[in-house]
Amino acid sequence: MIRTDAKDGALVLFSGGQDSATCVAWALERYQTVETLGFDYGQRHRVELECREGVRDALKHRFPAWAGRLGDDHMIDLSVLGAISDTAMTRTIEIETAANGLPNTFVPGRNLLFMTIAAAIAYRRGLRVLVGGMCETDFSGYPDCRDDTMKALQVALNLGMDTRVVLETPLMWLDKAQTWQLAEQLGGAALVELIRVETHTCYVGERAELHDWGFGCGECPACKLRKRGYEAYLKGERVTEAPL
């Protein structure tokens, strides 16, 4: 396994959602330079992209120790992905399970493209670590969120670019309650509140009502998962701490 240290710079895939915002904080706690990367692929919940700047600004102003580490932000137009996708993430259709057993919110190739583009940007920027919020503990079954997929992709990227990049997925084995707990461990109640209020998870892009767990419709799979995780976190239902 390729080893990294705090002197290495990191590029975090940052959508504006809970998981990726937690990953930004995780990286800021570890690396001297942290840049962020977002993608506009015509997602139905495009409001998440509008949250990105607010989250970055809040991290700088509320956490002085991290302010000097948070570097440039990059936004990539990946509308071609939306153009070739017929999913509930890119079309206004009912969210349901497809014939292949996967939810129709699955966008084929999304994380593969995201990480490949991220690796190319990291190569140019001299950053050795890529950080993503992929998770297969209480996820929706997306095959491109699996640990095996990320490990295989790391090998392919290093071979294809003759480089030594590391793909870090700090949430891979955490459930949503532990993800909230990790935020608390990283930045206390202030970071939990920042993530609760400033990030966006809802698949349908609803941001009119602030619930205890954050903004959202409360009915889509993403909202239900976030709500359930937040409630479990408040009850302290996880016995062990989230690993840092």
UniProtKB/Swiss-Prot annotation:
Its EC number is 6.3.4.20. It comes from Burkholderia vietnamiensis (strain G4 / LMG 22486) (Burkholderia cepacia (strain R1808)). Disulfide bonds: none annotated. Catalyzes the ATP-dependent conversion of 7-carboxy-7-deazaguanine (CDG) to 7-cyano-7-deazaguanine (preQ(0)). This is 7-cyano-7-deazaguanine synthase. Keywords: ATP-binding, Ligase, Metal-binding, Nucleotide-binding, Queuosine biosynthesis, Zinc. One of its GO terms (biological process) is queuosine biosynthetic process. Pathway: Purine metabolism; 7-cyano-7-deazaguanine biosynthesis. The keyword Cell inner membrane does not apply. Belongs to the QueC family.
